[in-house]
């Protein structure tokens, strides 16, 4: 059974305060997921890190390149971890474990799912169950035409109402060859945004 750093009892019931903040990093189906390893390394120098990857992100993300102390969870772990009543449910355990969540990159598809309340994979189940008194950051990555699409504007408005913090994309040459806005912010910018806004009082690990 896939578990989050030891038993669920230790996570939820012992009330121990971690020395470092607990950060859940997530990657979705964008070519910018090739930078996820760099993001994990940056955060793991400061925080206790766990990672979640959607099925599509695995086309770009090299699991073997992640830091050894960063456990990566996928949809397969969600479905293999529950056997009977009383077993921990992975997306709930991760929701309780994390003090902060960062989705980088956030694809247009996953943005639409979150805005619509869908929960059809491990990541979107965590977001649907998220305690919005705890910080949740997103760093979108998509083609310029998708970024400027009216649907994207609506979806960003919806997640803003939930209190989700946007780390805006940047303008550069995109993977498709187009030049424009839509590239994920650099990992250093994402890290600095989260680190500078961090308040120790947010550390609770109990959801």
State each model region's role.
Residues 1-138, 143-207:
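A cross-family phosphate/adenosyl-ligand binding-site feature
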